[in-house]
């Protein structure tokens, strides 16, 4: 299992602290996996302009940065980590509040925060489809209410044949654990 946490600047925009609940969920999920499913693995990655893996012990100290949202970089790293694991339970939980706004093209950042940029969106959707072909389900936890962003998440979810939850910050943890349990049981049977 890979948990992707969005640390782009929008995670603290407009007076809403979305990063603190995301960190709490990540810590609780890691505890659940370690105690109830000790044979499973949990890799935690964060993504902004780039994506990188962090240690579980570093989750409480996560901070957002002046980053855009490079969902592609996060998915690429998650896929790479899952390919190296022998566990049958290959899934990605992605906590995000917004649209993808950044990719790397020809070694340079290509960014666009205005609307949904088709170049960025198409690359993101292509990776969602590639995850599906590899048997990697993506569960997206959307913690923003914008209808056009929800439409993007719906398209992303359909492409991957994964799941999406549109949730408030309060109910975020319940959704993750319910879905993890459901996926876990299905993979064990």
Show which residues each predicted segment covers.
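Generic hydrophobic secondary-structure packing signal
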Residues: 18, 22, 70, 74, ...
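Von Willebrand factor
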Residues: 1-56, 59-95, 100-102, 139-148, ...
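Flexible beta-alpha connector loops of hexameric P-loop NTPases
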Residues: 14-18, 61-70, 113-118
């Amino acid at each position: 299992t890979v948990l992707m946490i969005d640390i782009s600047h929008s995670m603290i925009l407009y007076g809403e602290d979305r990063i603190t609940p995301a960190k709490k969920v990540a810590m609780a999920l890691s505890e659940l996996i370690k105690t109830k499913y000790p044979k499973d693995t949990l890799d935690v990655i964060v993504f902004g302009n780039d994506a990188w893996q962090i240690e579980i012990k570093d989750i409480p100290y996560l901070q957002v940065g002046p980053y855009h949202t490079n969902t592609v970089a996060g998915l690429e790293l998650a896929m790479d980590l899952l390919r190296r694991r022998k566990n049958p339970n290959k899934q990605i939980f992605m906590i995000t509040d917004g649209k993808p706004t950044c990719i790397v093209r020809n070694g340079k950042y290509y960014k666009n925060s205005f609307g949904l940029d088709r170049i960025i969106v198409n690359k993101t959707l292509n990776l969602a489809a590639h995850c599906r072909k590899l048997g990697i389900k993506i569960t997206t936890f959307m913690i923003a209410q914008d209808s056009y962003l929800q439409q993007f998440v719906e398209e992303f979810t359909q492409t991957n044949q994964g799941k999406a939850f549109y949730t408030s910050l309060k109910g975020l943890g319940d959704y993750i654990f319910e879905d993890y349990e459901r996926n876990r049981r299905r993979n064990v049977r």
